[in-house]
C-alpha cells in the first residue's frame, strides 16, 4: 500500500502546487513587436474567411439587413416577407447554381448588432478576435481602411476580409475567393513577390479554403462528377490556417435542419426548418454516412443522410408535413400545397446530391504540393455532440458526446477516417495538417485564446519559409 499512498500524496502535492501558481502568459508585444513593425517585401498579405453565419447579408433593394443585425427593421424570418429574404429561392428542376435572389454579402461579421427589447444597443463579439490578432501583427485591413474606420496614411493593405453568402454551395465560393486572392496580390507594392497569400479560415470557412486549395476557382460540375484535382488554388497560398473547421461535419447541422434553430434565445427570431433547409451549405456540414455519426436508435445501424427517401420517411426538414405553413410563406405564387411540397422535395434532393458531391471532392486522398503549409487549430476540452440516434418517429436524441469545442468534435476537425470503424493506430486523414494546435476554448472562443494569437503571429511573421 505504501507505493500507492506515496503516489497519491505526490499527485495531491502537484495539484496543490499547480493551483497556487497562476498561469503565465507570453508577452506577445515583446515577442512580435519588432517583426510586426518591420513590414518587408517577404510578408504575404492575409485573407480572413469567416464561417457559417459569419458574413453580413443585406437586401440592396430595400437596404434591410438580412443577417448580422437583429435591430428593428432587419429581416424577421417569423414573417412571410422576412422568411423569403432569409431563405434561398426554390425552383423545380433548376440547378442550385442558377437559383439567385436579391440578397448580397457585404462584410465579415466582426460584431453582431442587437437592438431588441431589453437588449437594445448591445453588440455581440464575433470575428473581431481574428482581426485583433492580425492588427497585433500590424496588418492593415482593407475593409477598415476603405470605410474610413482607420487611416493608414496611404500605406498598402495587407489584410483582406472575404465576405460570402454562407447559405449557398460551399464550392461556389471558390471563384470569388480566387478573385480576392488576385486582388490582394495586386495590391502589394512594387518589389514584393506578389506570389502567395496566407489565409486564416474559421469553421465552415475552412471547408471553403480546403476546396479552393484543391480545385482553385472551378465549381462542382452539374453532372455530379468531380473537377480535376490539380491543386490550382494552392499555387497562390503559402500558409493555410483552419480554425475549428468541421471537415467531417457536425451532427448539430442535422439537428438544425430538422428542428430549426433560435441562435440566441430571447434575442433572435426562430429560423424554421424549411428556411434553413433552403440553404445548400448547411447540408454540406452533415457528417458522412460511413462514420456512423447518425444511427437508427433501434438497430444502431448508420442512417444514410444523403438519401432523400430518408428525409421523407422520417418527415425531416423540407419533407416535414408540418412545414406546410412556412412553405406557403416561401412559395406564395405556387397555388397548391401539393405543388409546394413537390418543389421542396426537389430542392431537398438537389441539396443532398450537392453535399455528397462536395464531400467526395474534399475527402479524396491527395498530397498537397510543396510550398503549401496547412495548420489546424481545434478545441478538445468540451463535451460535444458526436452521435445522434433517430427514434422511430424521426425525433433526434444525442446518444453520445466526444471531446471537441462544443460544436465541432476533435475527430471532425482532424477529418479522422478511423471514426466509425475498428481502431487503428495513428490518425488517418486526407487533410495533411503539418501543425495542429489543440486548445481548451469553445468554438467561438478559439480565436480569442492567447495561444491562438501566439500561434498565428508566429506562423505569419516568424516561421521559416519552406
Language-model features and meaning:
Residues 8, 201, 344-347:
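Secondary-structure capping and boundary motifs in well-ordered enzyme cores
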Residues 18-200, 204-279, 285, 292-306, ...:
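N-terminal non-catalytic accessory region
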Residues 317, 322-466:
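C-terminal subdomain of alpha/beta-hydrolase-fold enzymes, centered on the catalytic histidine
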Residues 7-17:
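Bacterial N-terminal signal peptides
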Residues 7-8, 228, 365:
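Generic detector of short alpha-helix boundary/capping microenvironments
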Residues 1-4:
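Positively charged n-region of N-terminal signal peptides that target proteins for export
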